[in-house]
């Protein structure tokens, strides 16, 4: 098929429309935060920049060029089969004879489970996940910790027990750093560039620092507790329950690590000494995310218990760690016919077959150096001496499982039991026109590209306060995720049609409502 020719370019818009029809469930798409990036153009399938996570989401063993946007195309020619030990692979159940199979049946209607009134405010959506009873528990635990701390280390004459109103204001100050990124939340009272007089008048800096000193979600370890995150685990459990009850995900979902690295604005203003003093994160945060809306369905925190050989760094690229993470993230997904997209570190035949028995279907990118390739035919994992033409591919099938080797300036391998191997798709490239591919490759590119775009935008709204204690880091990341989820529910509600807030405006409104500077509607 011609690459970059005029005919291909003329056909591309129609092919793109056909692809959009297949992926119309990505209904929030590029406007997920009420704003458009420099590379949006109304197409949710292109990455926003060359540095986008989508470049790593579909890296090949030869060249790191991701699949582009999907579309529809006539059946392409397939790459000629290389000489291979056919008998061994046939004995293992793998065959080049392909058969059509229907997609996993899914009849559930995804979206919010509760209809919010048009008058609902930002804090109403936030409190779907962090309600008053959770905040009241923080008040109790913080006061308990302050009392025990002073019994042990001496009285603090400046301390007065915190109230629910003050706890909301405390959260509001912290959340404000997700909108106005600054080195320290104390900049609000500084009188400098990041100062905010209207916020500073609600609470004195001295009072804020006292609450920050004693703030706790769980004040004391119980005798049975051994988990390193015991100080935040009850909050994570409560948050998970609220995610489950507030939203029904679409059929297609993604397992991945969201962008939670250091804020680039902060790094740019740091001295080299300050950067050296900052401790490396001691945990890994994984999520299961709805690929139609960006709603994060489930959070999993893997704590690095120590620096020994069993620590997180030692297991960073090992399949057993990532398989454990995937099982934990999908423990509530059994029997629902979800389609889960995975990266190379999770993709494995053993895991996918295990999930299929539970009614969970998968489509994952495969890399020989990062994936568990046990049980896969060696001939499909070895690159031929002469590269095939762009868009050619080979497929072998075992039961419902298809192993795809597709060429696009590099070999890309996919393992899936969610898509028929005989169904055709197409990747649309701006300069090259359409590139034929199996439907599984097209679907992977569409959904992963959407999540990468979402990631690029929502990571800008993480709370930039960086505490040294691991449980506090996890807590503020979880709060940030809850706010982003709240905004998604807001965009899918009638309230969005009354006042169309962007993500930044929604965050600003939430801060002012928590600090009591704006009236919130009485929907709770």
UniProtKB/Swiss-Prot annotation:
Gene Ontology terms for molecular function: endonuclease activity; transposase activity
Consequence the record notes for mutating residue 353 to A: Decreased DNA transposase activity
Cellular localization per UniProt: Nucleus
Main localization, broad class: nucleus
Enzyme class: hydrolase
Record-listed E.C. numbers: 3.1.-.-
Record note on what altering residue 244 to A does: No effect on DNA transposase activity
Pathological condition linked to this protein in its record: Induces site-specific DNA rearrangements, including intrachromosomal deletions, as well as inversions, duplications and translocations, in rhabdoid tumors that share developmental origin with cells that normally express PGBD5, even though these tumors may not exhibit apparent widespread genomic instability. This activity recurrently targets regulatory elements and tumor suppressor genes and promotes cell transformation.
Name the UniProt record assigns to this protein: PiggyBac transposable element-derived protein 5
Biological source species: Homo sapiens (Human)
Lineage of producing organism: Eukaryota, Metazoa, Chordata, Craniata, Vertebrata
